[in-house]
Amino acid sequence: MAENSVLTVSIVTPDGQVYDDDQVTMLVVNTKEGELGILPNHVPVIAALAIDEVRVKHSQEEDVIAVNGGFVEFSENTATIVADTAENQSDIDVARAESAKKRAEATIRKAQQAHDNSELRRAQISLRRAINRINVSKH
């Protein structure tokens, strides 16, 4: 494999492509096992993603994308992220994310009182997604 100084990063969801850049110097994702930094010429990898931000670095700038689950596949200097949902920082509706956070917190309280574990798990995931969107919007 020839040495290369950049990566290509693509983020897709069931609704279509969210992000595409072929001049990336570093990709940072949070997997179920922890944070993973990918530089050009990294060994091939496939990993399940956590609900968290994805950071895409190029030259002196960094793009931040809220990713809610999925996986990353990297080989031959191309990273493809297939996510359940993903939003660019500039596309996040903060008021909507704050509202979703409040709804999830209320649902968690109700589920705890009712001892409804399945509803509790769903609400906890919704809360993590809302917090992720809020955090990414602040970058």
From Swiss-Prot:
Its main location: membrane. It holds the Pfam family ATP-synt_DE_N. GO terms for cellular component: plasma membrane; proton-transporting ATP synthase complex. GO terms for molecular function: ATP binding; proton-transporting ATP synthase activity, rotational mechanism. It is found in: Cell membrane. Keywords: ATP synthesis, Cell membrane, CF(1), Hydrogen ion transport, Ion transport, Membrane, Transport. It comes from the Bacteria. It is a peripheral membrane protein. CDD domains: F1-ATPase_delta. NCBIfam families: ATP_synt_epsi, PRK00571.1-3. Belongs to the ATPase epsilon chain family. F-type ATPases have 2 components, CF(1) - the catalytic core - and CF(0) - the membrane proton channel. CF(1) has five subunits: alpha(3), beta(3), gamma(1), delta(1), epsilon(1). CF(0) has three main subunits: a, b and c. PANTHER family: ATP SYNTHASE DELTA/EPSILON CHAIN, ATP SYNTHASE EPSILON CHAIN, CHLOROPLASTIC. Produces ATP from ADP in the presence of a proton gradient across the membrane. This is ATP synthase epsilon chain. It comes from Pediococcus pentosaceus (strain ATCC 25745 / CCUG 21536 / LMG 10740 / 183-1w).
